[in-house]
Amino acid sequence: MEAEGRREQGKPRKGRVCSSLWPEGYPAAGTLTARVDISTRPYRNLSGVGAGRPRLSPQGGQRGRPHSRRRHRTTFSPAQLEQLESAFGRNQYPDIWAREGLARDTGLSEARIQVWFQNRRAKQRKQERSLLQPLAHLSPATFSGFLPEPPACPYSYPTPPPPMTCFPHPYNHALPSQPSTGGSFARHPQSEDWYPTLHPTPTGHLPCPPAPPVLPLSLEPPKSWN
C-alpha cells in the first residue's frame, strides 16, 4: 500500500503543469493557466450572452465594413433644364459634338449631359409602358365604343324597280300574216280583250305591245302633175 501511494504521488496530476518544468523566474503554473483561460474565454455583454470579440475601428488596425460610396447628385437650374429638354425634343441621341455644344451653353460637363440624356430616355420609355399597360387587357370590341358613329345620310335614294320581262304575244306566231286593212286592224284590239283575263301575267312582267302594222311603201317615183 505504501508503494502504491508513493507511485501516485510521483505521477503528475492531470490539469496541472509540473512546476519542475518551469525555470525559476517564471510565474507559477496556476497563474499562467488562469491567464490562458481568460484569453480564450469569450467576451460577454451586460445581458450575459456571449457576443464574441468586439470589432475594432479601422484606426485600431482592423478594417470594418466598407462604407457605400455616396453619389454626387447634380442639381440643374430651370434654364439648363429648358435647354436640355429642347435639345432632347430635337434629337434624343445627340453625338459628341452636340453634347459639347450643350456643355458650352449650359456650363455643364459633357459627361453630365450624356448621363442626363440616358436618364431622360429611360424616363420616356417608362412613361410609354405605363400608358400602354392599361390598354393591353382591352379587347378590340371595346375600342368600337370609343369610335364615333358615321353620320346618317340625309338623302334617301329610291330603289330601282325590278327589270320587266317581255313575253312574246301568242298571236304574233299563231296567226298568219294578213294584209293590213282598216277593218282587220280595227277588229284586232277587240279580239285581244279576253287574253289578260284568261292568262294573268305575273307581277312586274307585262306583255310586250304588239308590233305596229307594216304599211306597204310605194317604190314608184312620184308623178309630176303638170
From Swiss-Prot:
Disordered as annotated region, ranges: 1-77, 175-226
Compositionally biased region (Basic and acidic residues): 1-11
Keywords (A to Z) from UniProt: DNA-binding, Homeobox, Nucleus
Localization, UniProt: Nucleus
GO biological process: pituitary gland development; regulation of transcription by RNA polymerase II
DNA-binding in keyword set: yes
Chief place of localization: nucleus
Bias kind Basic residues: ranges: 64-74
Extent of Low complexity compositional bias: 196-206, 216-226
GO molecular function, one term: DNA-binding transcription factor activity, RNA polymerase II-specific
Tissues in which the UniProt entry reports expression: Exclusively expressed in the developing pituitary gland.
InterPro entries listed in its UniProt record: HD, Homeobox_CS, Homeodomain-like_sf, PROP1
GO cellular component annotations of the record: nucleus; transcription regulator complex
Family of the protein in this entry: Belongs to the paired homeobox family.
Known role: Possibly involved in the ontogenesis of pituitary gonadotropes, as well as somatotropes, lactotropes and caudomedial thyrotropes.
Protein name, UniProt field: Homeobox protein prophet of Pit-1
Annotated organism of origin: Sus scrofa (Pig)
Primary gene name: PROP1
